[in-house]
Amino acid sequence: MVSIRNFHEQDARQLQQLKYQYKSIEEIKEIINLWNEKAYNGSYYEMFAVCDQDEIVGSVSLYKHSDYIISAGPEIYMPYRKKGYGYEALMLAYDYAKDLGYKIASAQIRTDNVASMRLHEKLGFQRDCEMINRKGKSVYIYLKQL
């Protein structure tokens, strides 16, 4: 069964194997502690472990854009991709955001990222517009009412 939860310092070794091979356990624990502060640049931000049973298969973050708009960013680690974890992680993250009072989910997806577009459409998102992001890349904005 897939679930999301906050990261714990005990997750550092598993994160080192899956994502942060070139960081020490202490550096990874510092990253986890920063995530658990639930803020980034003065806005609400929360990072969750995506778990299948007790095994971490990825992460998903929530980022506040306004009092009513939030976005989520999933990262499923390489050995676990293409198994439906991204869909489950986003469903759980957006359910959590709805419980917190958010009304709209927003996603910025590169125009060449067909897999992400399909995933968001499967989740009920609709394409709203196209724009150039801060990195100079063409992206679509997808929106969904929570």
Give names to the regions the model predicted.
Residues D99-I109:
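Conserved GNAT acetyl-CoA-binding A-motif
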Residues K64-P74, R81, G101-K103, N133-S138:
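A conserved beta-turn-beta hairpin within the catalytic core of GNAT-like acetyltransferases
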